[in-house]
From Swiss-Prot:
Its cofactor is Fe(3+). GO terms for molecular function: 2',3'-cyclic-nucleotide 3'-phosphodiesterase activity; metal ion binding. Fe cation 2 binds at E42, N70, H157, H182. It comes from Mycoplasma genitalium (strain ATCC 33530 / DSM 19775 / NCTC 10195 / G37) (Mycoplasmoides genitalium). Belongs to the YmdB-like family. Fe cation 1 binds at D11, E42, N43, H184. It comes from the Bacteria. The active site is at H71 (proton donor). Keywords: Hydrolase, Iron, Metal-binding. Its EC number is 3.1.-.-. It is an enzyme of class 3 (hydrolase). This is Putative phosphatase/phosphodiesterase MG246.
Amino acid sequence: MDNIKVLFLGDVYGKAGRKIISDHLPIIKKKYQLNLIIANAENTTNGKGLSWNHYQILKQAGIDYITMGNHTWFQKQDLELVLNQVDVIRPLNLMQDFNYFQLGKGSYLFSLNGLKIRITNLLGTSINLPFAITNPFVELKKLVLTKDCDLHIVDFHAETTSEKNAFCMVFDGYVTAILGTHTHVPSNDLRITPKGSVYITDVGMCGPGFGSVIGANPKQSIKLFCTGERQFFEVSNCGAQLNGVFFEVCSKTNQVVKIEQIRIVLDDEKYLANDYFNLVE
């Protein structure tokens, strides 16, 4: 039996994210002989949520399973349709009285090449949704104790590096992979932990390039930091980047035998043409 080869793609953000995945994923899949492709798609539609049309685009590009995050519930016109797809996994740790608790699932168990594989999506406590979420540490421990799978891949969608590091300390060796998402900035700490789990604080995003502020129009972000004025962030149209984590698992031992960070950056001249100095007053 061949080893399981997995690719996890960071937060898909807007048109740039959809396009770079559609253009490059077939090449990556062939190069790495992938068995399983997972992507966090919570920012796919205008930076917030996932529409039915964009769900179909990601599926056509070759993504097998989709995880979500704190923007899961923004595309309300398609919410029930998208979340009830068998391959879409929304955050697990929701309060039962949360409005959308009944839609979708937070963890999914399936078989691949004779192995039972579970994918789980969790929101960190550092995500400011106190009215909606339960503790991710407690919820994952409950799930781990069921011991119902050979491989367990966790998308931990959290704000702070400290919470993600603490999460890794708790679940090192109890799950196959802990893949941080949400901040859109790839961290430089991909590793196989002492007890054998894949860990990275943040995978990064698949979206606009360096001419954006984590995917958004820089003018609006700069204004927020200078004046405190909040407004809807437009998705930047400057360049593109793809960030992902590849890992290979031995099908005989269920141990991770190889990891690699995948990064493609396609920036353009729009970045050089912009000068934001005078936005500061």
